[in-house]
């Protein structure tokens, strides 16, 4: 599903929101970096399974230019199948915020939900063991507050709720439960 493009995305994204972008071809990171304001928080999706190409876009020119002190958020959204060497590479390039994880690639697109739990758990454990300074955003199967609590106990700093969004009544109940549970310590950005 294609969107309306980067200019439209920038126009519709408030200064305190995160703009999610992906590179499709080799020079996209360079082109996007020259267009996106330096102060705009971004999430770099390096693994969108809905694209025709399934490759590691961190090898594309300009990926390493994104980390900056001017952005509050410069998140890399990794695939659930991310290798430890890919995670090492991302951190060594200067990224300190990682979203684990994207949807699981299938022949028919990306699969989300509870199937991501073991993948997200593996990524959180590795990052917190090897790079405790990295902020981890955990996602995958969060439908109830206890799912966020599970990820928090593994070391997640923030949470991404996608699965619950398929039911608008469920998502608000889940967000309110998470925000109302002081043991989880969730804050909205």
Locations of the language-model features?
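Surface-exposed amphipathic alpha-helices with a cationic face
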Residues: 10-14, 64-71, 91, 124-132, ...
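Glycine/Thr-rich beta-alpha phosphate-binding loop at enzyme active sites
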Residues: 46-59, 80, 85-134, 168-174
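C-terminal helical cap(s) of enzyme catalytic domains, especially alpha/beta-barrels
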Residues: 107-117, 152-189
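Hydrophobic residues within beta-strands of alpha/beta enzymes
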Residues: 42, 98, 159-160
